[in-house]
């Protein structure tokens, strides 16, 4: 009987079993060892190993032919650890922002062209904006999204805009030129503003959180029912967000050049 199985879930499960086996062995394994340990035909195991090798999940020693875990998995692990670190680091600073402004704070990153809320903090007042962890928001018309887009190449921003653009309110930017000009301002001043572009009457501010490499990996922001973006209240909130984002960046190893 053939072991051929076109079910993608089953294929992933088989690949995961092999990765677990190599990890637990704590040494490179041969094709024969892997096939015997998993109870699968060598041809099936070889196909899975070849696929995983092509994407860097496993590496094959040119001299011995044995397989070991690839660098790509280390990169994924580092990314996960980085996210865990920033969530721990940002918890108290976000609470402090909420206490000082009585508005909602959120930490986010870019996920397939949209803003993904990683963590949030909300005031105790009855009237506040809810920022749900795990929720996706448009990137081109939110303060946090514009901060994240501002660090991307123009071609990447254009693709995201063309894929996701729509008019959420009368204030939403519906042309790429308008967005591009706004992102230029974001880079120059070091923060982004949201002025009723996603939800009428809702305003926000966000600043970039840099990693040790100098890239903008996260955005930290406040969102609420600020009366005006030119008010003393909003200017004070902006200064707090920028200061807090800078402190988080430094905690992640970033240093201003």
Model-found features: residue ranges?
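Intrinsically disordered, acidic Ser/Thr/Pro-rich low-complexity regulatory segments
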Residues: 111-145, 172-207
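N-terminal helix-turn-helix
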Residues: 1-88, 246-254
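Amphipathic alpha-helical effector-binding/dimerization core
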Residues: 63-163
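Short, structured helix-loop boundary elements
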Residues: 8-12, 31, 66, 70, ...
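Extended hydrophobic
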Residues: 175-247
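Cysteine/selenocysteine-centered motifs that mediate thiol-based redox chemistry or coordinate metal-sulfur cofactors
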Residues: 159-167, 245-257
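A structural signal for short hydrophobic beta-strand segments in well-ordered beta-sheet cores
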Residues: 58-60, 107-108, 209
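A structural microfeature
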Residues: 56, 117-119, 218
């Amino acid at each position: 009987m053939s072991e051929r199985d076109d079910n993608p879930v089953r294929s992933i499960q088989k690949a995961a079993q092999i990765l677990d086996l190599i990890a637990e062995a704590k040494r490179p394994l041969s094709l024969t060892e892997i096939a015997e340990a998993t109870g699968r035909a060598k041809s099936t195991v070889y196909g899975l190993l070849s696929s995983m090798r092509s994407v860097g999940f496993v590496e094959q020693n040119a001299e011995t032919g044995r397989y070991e875990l690839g660098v790509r998995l280390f990169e994924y692990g580092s990314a996960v650890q980085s996210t865990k670190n920033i969530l721990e680091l940002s918890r108290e600073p976000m609470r402090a922002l909420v206490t000082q402004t009585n508005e909602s704070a959120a930490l986010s990153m870019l996920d397939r062209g949209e803003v993904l809320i990683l963590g949030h903090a909300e005031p105790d007042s009855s009237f506040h904006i809810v920022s749900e962890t795990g929720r996706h928001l448009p990137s081109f018309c939110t303060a946090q999204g514009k901060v994240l887009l501002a660090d991307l190449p123009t071609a990447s921003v254009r693709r995201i805009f063309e894929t996701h653009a729509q008019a959420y309110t009368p204030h939403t930017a519906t042309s790429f030129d308008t967005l591009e000009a706004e992102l230029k301002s974001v880079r120059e001043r070091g923060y982004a503003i949201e002025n009723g572009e996603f939800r009428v009457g809702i305003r926000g501010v966000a600043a970039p959180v840099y990693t040790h490499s100098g890239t903008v990996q996260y955005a930290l922001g406040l969102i609420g029912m600020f009366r005006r973006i030119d008010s003393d209240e909003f200017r004070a909130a902006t200064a707090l967000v920028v200061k807090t984002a800078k402190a988080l960046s430094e905690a992640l190893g970033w240093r201003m050049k």
